[in-house]
UniProtKB/Swiss-Prot annotation:
GO biological processes: cytoplasmic translation
GO CC terms: cytosolic large ribosomal subunit
Entry annotated with the keyword Ribosomal protein: yes
Keyword tags: Ribonucleoprotein, Ribosomal protein
Family in the record: Belongs to the eukaryotic ribosomal protein eL31 family.
SUPFAM superfamilies to which the protein is assigned, alphabetical: Ribosomal protein L31e (SSF54575)
Ribosomal protein recorded as keyword: yes
Source organism of this protein record: Hyperthermus butylicus (strain DSM 5456 / JCM 9403 / PLM1-5)
NCBIfam families in UniProt: PRK01192.1-1
Molecular functions (GO terms): structural constituent of ribosome
Record-given protein name: Large ribosomal subunit protein eL31
Length: 100
């Protein structure tokens, strides 16, 4: 697969962050998004810029319960070589209610 893409839409599965301990799942989800985009665009992880909307969406249910997947749009700037990651679709996440 060529790594000279300019723009792409991805649904990134974040279920892998649930394997570890609960206390830093959202932070690991951000790192996973960065690593995923870097791998698919052929750039370093330092060259991936995550938009604030993506960060807020992942942290929306606190540090322990990030969403299972996130759909993002990644755009590569040909001049700087940096990739910007933006949220494309935000599904409604609601806190679960206790059932009796």
């Amino acid at each position: 697969m060529p790594k000279d893409k300019k723009e792409a839409i991805y649904t990134i599965p974040l279920s892998r962050v649930y394997w570890g301990r609960r206390t830093n799942r959202a932070a690991r989800a951000i790192k996973l998004v960065r690593k995923f985009i870097a791998r698919h665009f052929g750039v370093k992880e330092e060259d991936v810029i995550i938009h604030n909307n993506v960060n807020e969406y992942i942290w929306s249910r606190s540090i322990e319960k990030p969403p299972r997947r996130v759909t993002v749009k990644a755009v590569k700037d040909p001049e700087t070589g940096k990739v910007k990651v933006m949220l494309i679709r935000e599904s409604k996440i609601q806190q679960g209610q206790a059932t009796s």
